[in-house]
Amino acid sequence: MPTDMELSPSNVARHRLAVLAAHLSAASLEPPVMASSLEAHCVSAQTMVAPPELVKGTLTIVDERTGKRYQVQVSEEGTIKATDLKKITTGPNDKGLKLYDPGYLNTAPVRSSISYIDGDLGILRYRGYPIEELAESSTYVEVAYLLMYGNLPSQSQLADWEFAISQHSAVPQGLVDIIQAMPHDAHPMGVLVSAMSALSVFHPDANPALRGQDLYKSKQVRDKQIARIIGKAPTIAAAAYLRLAGRPPVLPSSNLSYSENFLYMLDSLGNRSYKPNPRLARVLDILFILHAEHEMNCSTSAARHLASSGVDVFTALSGAVGALYGPLHGGANEAVLKMLSEIGTVNNIPEFIEGVKNRKRKMSGFGHRVYKNYDPRAKVIRKLAEEVFSIVGRDPLIEVAVALEKAALSDEYFVKRKLYPNVDFYSGLIYRAMGFPPEFFTVLFAIPRMAGYLAHWRESLDDPDTKIIRPQQVYTGEWLRHYIPPNERLVPAKADRLGQVSVSNASKRRLSGSGI
């Protein structure tokens, strides 16, 4: 059973060989048809062979309010320092210009070398590697190493990495007890958020608030937390799934690949000799690769925001998972399934399309904040759907999805607005076909994204520009008021106030009693 305790040298060597063999076996299980289907999409990711030309210089700003001219430095990356705008003032009482950027639409708070996106060309690369190549040839654990340390591992490095993750895949019994104490119908994402936060309590050795703020300067300490979280994430997720199903948690296996082990914990029913379908495990592994990282999205930004305070990594990632729990971020594929179910049949698509154009219906799974082209992850996922259906049976909603995509991409309304399928459009169909309930979809997003969160956490610790994140605001409230006693106040009729707070019948029963 994997634990955080050391094994004997002979067992260590034996286990490394075992996990390496499992890794190589899993990598070879991808059917030729899947490899060939992905091959065509690798070309599009290579369209921009050379990096964009970098030109630095100065920007001249003329302030028409005062007639003054200002020179602002422009970096090679095409950025200016927001603090340079503070010198643009109208007088001694003016504190300078601020950038008002709701949602950070055009604000870059970090420099990062982890992932690259070109939304116009539909390109996504991890550390320079096209996502299509990694999905075709790599494994999730190998990609996690790439994201973390900047290069693909050697064979021996991969064996050490897989062993470290496996070594830390078991969770403390106290954490299992916490999960088991939650309501039987607790949402799996709520369980995951709570469990990630609770890990901080079980590992005080990893808390800078308890061990000193320089704790994470130690590479050994950092690496241990990385292995802990990547190792424990699927175990916690499996416990949440089994709690929802009314079944006891299952200990992880040390003889399976990362994705196989996850499916084993879900499906073994205590049978230690059980092995998941290798093709389904490979599909899940590819999905994990596709969801592992996506630069400064909402939840990754939350992780870096929290980490900037020096908080422990478990709390930082708990906040990130909490952000992912939001339906605008991690729950879109569930909305796609609901939409496709409501459409029902291919014959209803024209009416639905017109409803979208008339703003009477909402199309989920199309469009992206970054991509103004076909999401490269969606191309891969669409092909994976056929692989899953060949094993578990075809989902009739796939015909609706394919026809809806075709109709939208041939309609000027969507083409003009650059609305293309995103990563969520087909992923929900795959997860449903594999037997996952909709409430578990976001958990399947969170497990692999731990690698991206941790890569950004690690990068932020080494970045000399990292500061505690403290954005400015534009104040729009009352300028100055003085305190008036309650009995003398005149509250405007249209003033905001506390609304009616509902009282349960149980509370009404209690309040109707005496002695209260």
UniProtKB/Swiss-Prot annotation:
Q: Which GO terms describe its molecular function?
A: citrate (Si)-synthase activity
Q: Does the keyword Transferase apply?
A: yes
Q: What is this protein called?
A: Citrate synthase, glyoxysomal
Q: Where in the cell is it found?
A: Glyoxysome
Annotated EC: 2.3.3.16
Q: What is the predominant subcellular site recorded for this chain?
A: other
Q: Give, as one word, the top-level EC class.
A: transferase
UniProt feature coiled coil, ranges? none
Active site at which residues? Answer: H329, H368, D424
What GO biological process, any one, is recorded here? Answer: glyoxylate cycle
According to UniProt, this protein's pathway is:
Carbohydrate metabolism; glyoxylate cycle; isocitrate from oxaloacetate: step 1/2
Q: Which reaction does it catalyse?
A: oxaloacetate + acetyl-CoA + H2O = citrate + CoA + H(+)
